[in-house]
């Protein structure tokens, strides 16, 4: 399964994998890469910045996510969102307030 990976403009370490099932015969130039992603995710994700194109298989290792979860999501939804790792704090982010208060 081929996919393109985009970085979020709003959240550090958030990435979106977009399925490219017809690669290399598809023509994605000029298209909105997030056109098939739900509006709520698009809003949180912000402007996508292209990072790379990958060919995924069950034997491929990914740094932070299980490739089987990514492949399943790409096949069923057409996309996979990789959230920032827990505990990741961006010092330039605005404070979110007290949690659990």
Swiss-Prot record:
Membrane-spanning parts: none
SUPFAM superfamilies linked: YcgL-like (SSF160191)
Residues covered by the YcgL domain: 1-93
Protein's recorded name: YcgL domain-containing protein ACIAD2309
Lineage, uppermost ranks: Bacteria, Pseudomonadati, Pseudomonadota, Gammaproteobacteria, Moraxellales
């Amino acid at each position: 399964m081929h996919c393109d990976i985009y970085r979020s403009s709003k959240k550090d370490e958030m990435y979106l994998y977009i399925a490219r099932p017809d690669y290399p015969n598809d023509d994605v130039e000029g298209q909105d890469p997030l056109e098939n992603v739900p509006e709520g995710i698009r809003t949180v994700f912000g402007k996508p910045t292209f990072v790379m194109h990958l060919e995924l298989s069950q034997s491929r290792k990914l740094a932070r996510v299980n490739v089987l979860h990514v492949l399943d999501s790409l096949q069923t939804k057409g996309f996979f969102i990789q959230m920032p790792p827990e505990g990741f704090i961006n010092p330039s982010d605005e404070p979110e307030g007290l949690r659990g208060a």
